[in-house]
Design a protein with these regions (language model features):
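Hydrophobic structural segments
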Residues: 1-181
Length: 181
């Protein structure tokens, strides 16, 4: 089934995460089938409303329903649970296992969007190798152009070091705080 496939592909049981991540199926739907999937970063009430309105049976999120820890089932927490139950919307969350995935993770996806191919990792977070390590030769200005094109955002270059980059590390998300300057 889909949940088993996701759990296996993303190595849910193998990768340590923050205690409130609660990776995997967080809420099942009452009919047990999936024909339409919605995806979002956070499992917020507005996101769940949009997913339900679109007729989704499954909402895939990066930060799940319990990210803030234990909470009483009142207010917006109750509204989220009731909405999902009434709409038949299952919720599946995947945090660090998705971040660290060698082909589906943000680091690998960004590398490919830049026209670069990761050749390994360069750090460990919670005991798991992560961060896309790239060995290439690319001019700083060319890399900045590719980054602007891939992200649609303006890139600010703080030039330093050689004009040609030969080793690049890509680290998305909060784990960048674990890299010493």
């Amino acid at each position: 089934d889909l949940v088993t496939h996701l759990d296996t592909e993303l190595r849910i049981s193998e990768i340590e995460d923050y205690s409130n991540a609660l990776n995997g199926l967080q809420m099942e739907n009452h009919h047990g089938t999936v024909s339409k999937i919605a995806a979002a970063v956070d499992a917020t009430l507005p996101v769940m409303r949009k997913a339900a309105a679109a007729g989704a049976d499954l909402l895939l999120v990066h930060h799940g329903m319990f990210w803030s820890g234990l909470q009483s089932w009142t207010g917006h927490v109750f509204q989220k649970l009731k909405l999902c139950h009434d709409a038949g919307l299952a919720v599946y969350s995947c945090h660090l296992p998705l971040d660290f995935h060698p082909t589906l993770g943000n680091d690998a996806v960004l590398a490919r969007a830049l026209g670069l191919e990761p050749c390994g990792t360069f750090m460990k977070t919670k005991g798991t190798e992560n961060g896309a390590r790239i060995e290439t030769e690319i001019a700083r200005d060319e890399l900045a152009k590719r980054l602007e094109s891939a992200t649609g955002a303006r890139v600010h270059v703080c030039a330093g070091g050689p004009e040609i980059a030969r080793r690049i590390g890509i680290m998305t998300g909060g784990a960048g705080a674990e890299v010493a300057a």
